[in-house]
Each structure stands twice: as structure tokens, then as C-alpha cells.
Amino acid sequence: MNYQLLWKSAIFSVSSMMAISAVQAAPLNVMTEDYPPFNMQGEGGKIVGLSTEVVEELFKRAGVEYKLTLMPWKRAYEDTLGTPNTALYSTTRTPEREALFKWVGPLVNNNWVFFSSSTANITVKSLEDAKQYSVGGYNGDAAAEYLKAQGFAKLQLAANDTANVKKLEAGRIDLWATGQYLAPYLASKEKVASPKPIFVFKETQMSLAFNKDTPDELITKLNEILAAMKADGTIDKINAKYQ
């Protein structure tokens, strides 16, 4: 019997539980924004969505107590940056954000897509092609930040992505840069024609971002549990509900 291996495993298990106990001095403050179908307000004010289901199952398996709050993205982002015992989802893990947080994920895939209106005749085959058009995004969104960094001079930022549904339909923007699932969802909600996806400009994934003061042992434990959820088919079952 490999007693050294057993001893190391025991130490790791105890360390993991200590990390969870340390966080549980108060419930973990988990924040999210209204970003359907990943995170959104459902009936009775309950926070629901694809990512929410993954997060709830993850914390259930880990035995982590938490409080879930829906708020504007920029406020949630700044709070998670500056306040211990906080986490934020669904957060795109970009090079610019990598060192700002500790990460558990990915939770879900969410490609960034240029959409045109249902009646427009626009062809985009590259980011350079898209620069000639007015493009709608929203403040604080990772996709909008990415396009800014790529030199999109005609980028128009709204307070939220719902505004871009109406702007695209009214012809006030030529393209809408957003997640692959969000555009058709919001169009249906606003009762307008579903926009046309014309170019995937970046393949992305979204994760749980934790304040930097979060114990490494807890991050490791949560990533292990998330990997187990993928291996046992839990993630696939949740995804299937939103297809």
C-alpha cells in the first residue's frame, strides 16, 4: 500500500475542507448580470439560466453556502475585483482579465457573433470587413472591449444588449456584436424578427471569476468538481435544456 500517496490525499482533502470553511465564515457573495439564457431573472424573482444551473450544482456538490445576486455588469465586476469572498459569472476569461481574478471553469461555450438584421444584405468574412459598418455592443461587455482593442472606430455602446435589438431592427446600427445564444433569445423576447448570424469573430468560453483573495485550495476543489460534472454527463444534460 502506498502510504505516502494516502497521506498526501488525506492532507489535500483536509486542506480543501478548511478552504471551504474559511470562505464560509460568511456565505459567498455570488453576483451575476441579466444575460439570457445563461443568467436571468425568472418567475418570482428567482435567478435562473444555463450557467446558473451549473453554478448551483457545483456549489451543492462542494458544500459551499452562497448568496446569489443579480445586478448591472459593471457594478458586479468592480465589486468582485475589490471585495473578498465574492465571485462573478458568466465571465469571459480574456488575457486582460486573467491576472485580475482566480478562475473556475469553463462553465459554458459562448461564441461571439456579428448579427445583421433579417432583411440586410451584408457579407462579413473577417474582422477587417466588419470595420466599415456601425457595430452595436454594450458598456463593460468583453466582446465590446475586444472590438475596441481591434480598432473598431464605429462601435456604438448601449447600456445593455436589449437596446441593441431595437437599434438593429430600426437600422440605427448595421451589425450587432453579441453572444450566439443571446441575440435570438432577445429578439424573441422583444417580438422582432430574429437577426441573421453572419460571422463568428471569436470562439469564447465563460467561467466563474473569484476575487483574488479566495483560497487556492477552494479554487482547485471547485475545478475538480466541475471536471467531474462534465465527465458524468451533468453539464451535457443542462446544456440540452437550452438548445
Predicted regions span which residues?
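Extracytoplasmic small-molecule ligand-binding "clamshell" domains
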Residues: 26-100, 232
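Extended ligand-binding regions for polar small-molecule ligands
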Residues: 49-61, 208-242
